[in-house]
Amino acid sequence: MNMLSFKTSFGWITLTEGNNKISSVEFGKNKNKGKSILLTKLQKQILEFTKGKRKKFSTKLKIDGTPLQKKIWHQLSLIKYGSTKTYGDIAKILNTSPRYVGNVCGQNNHLLIIPCHRVVRSDGTLGGFSGLGGIKLKKKLLNLEKK
């Protein structure tokens, strides 16, 4: 397993790769371990994103979860840059509860790539965010995408 931590304008981000797929994208600092072209390419894409110069990511993800969790994460990945959907919007598509969608968002190991920060409450408030920095970071990410 390879790991790469780097600093962005949103704080430290740590990428983890195994078997030539990204296994996690998390906020926070960790020790670098090994080298990987895949990690270096994703680092470049994330740095471009944090500067407002990239709207989509292109990488291979290793996604572990139940079939319903994977469907929810897929729905999140369809939310376009600069847009938001509610937990209820996602729940309705998959015939599940908004609360469950929120719980699955909190289990997302691929922050930014699977954009759980684009999911908000039906009353327009932000809801939660599992990334280090919580709601403040979620608001910052959404503001970046509004520009």
Outline where the language-model segments fall:
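Generic structural "secondary-structure junction" signal
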Residues: 59-65, 121-122, 128-131
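Residue-level detection of the helix-turn-helix DNA-binding "recognition helix"
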Residues: 106
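…primarily DNA-binding HTH/wHTH and HhH modules…
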Residues: 125-147
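Structural signal for hydrophobic
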Residues: 76, 116-117, 141
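Basic nucleic-acid-binding alpha-helical/helix-turn surface characteristic of O6-alkylguanine DNA
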Residues: 1-99, 144-147
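Short Lys/Arg-enriched helix C-cap and helix-to-coil transition segments
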Residues: 112-122
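Acidic, glycine-rich catalytic loops of TOPRIM or P-loop NTPase phosphate-binding modules used
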Residues: 109
